Regions:
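Bacterial Sec signal peptide processing site at the extreme N-terminus
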Residues: 17-36
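A short, Trp-centered hydrophobic/proline-enriched beta-strand micro-motif
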Residues: 38-53
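Helix-rich interaction surfaces within compact, conserved domain-sized segments
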Residues: 101-161
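Structural motif
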Residues: 45, 73-77, 140
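Mature extracytoplasmic domains of secretory-pathway proteins
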Residues: 69-115
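Sec-dependent bacterial lipoprotein signal peptides
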Residues: 1-20
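Short, surface-exposed charged micro-motifs
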Residues: 38, 66-68, 132
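N-terminal post-signal-peptidase region of extra-cytosolic proteins
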Residues: 51-64
Length: 161
């Protein structure tokens, strides 16, 4: 009976040590991810893969195709779906939120510890857009898009490297 109790205590102690090691590995992975996010934002070289859209009118939608928003140095590559009211557009609806343009304004601030707020202004042949992007240390992101001729729309996704 004594050997049985000793073996139980040893197994419980081993399990406890293994659990602590897993937590430490998880914390290290989170710290590495946060450092990678910070570096990508500092370099102005990141891509957000979008998986949900939240139109102003109507319900949210899960996106199954590959939609993304990418910032590379002084350029914005917007490949996002749009659903909502649009006013005074060219025949056929125009390009929507699918364009590659130079960034006219870029402001980045670190918010409460684990959040970055980025505001990007861009103009194409149809409209002027303001992209407000929130990126968290774990890579989760939200994008709000405002323009003069279209209803606002929001997206959520994840930073990819």
């Amino acid at each position: 009976m004594k050997k049985f109790l000793v073996s139980i205590v040893c197994m419980a102690g081993g399990a406890l040590l293994a659990a602590c090691g897993t937590t430490l590995g998880s914390a290290e992975a989170s710290a590495e991810r946060a450092a990678a996010v910070k570096q990508a934002l500092a370099d102005r070289n990141f891509k957000i893969e979008v998986n949900f859209m939240y139109p102003m009118r109507g319900s949210s939608r899960n996106l199954t195709s590959e939609y993304s928003l990418e910032v590379r140095n002084d350029s914005l590559f917007s490949h996002l779906p749009y659903m909502g009211e649009a006013r005074n557009l060219p025949y056929g609806g125009g390009v929507g939120l699918n364009f590659d343009e130079h960034i006219s304004s870029y402001v980045q601030q670190q918010q409460k510890g684990d959040e970055y707020l980025i505001e990007i202004g861009v103009k194409n042949t149809e409209d002027v857009y303001v992209y407000t992007i929130r990126v968290f240390d774990n890579g989760r992101s939200s994008i709000d898009v405002r323009s003069r001729l279209r209803d606002p729309i929001s997206y959520s996704g994840e930073l990819s490297f």
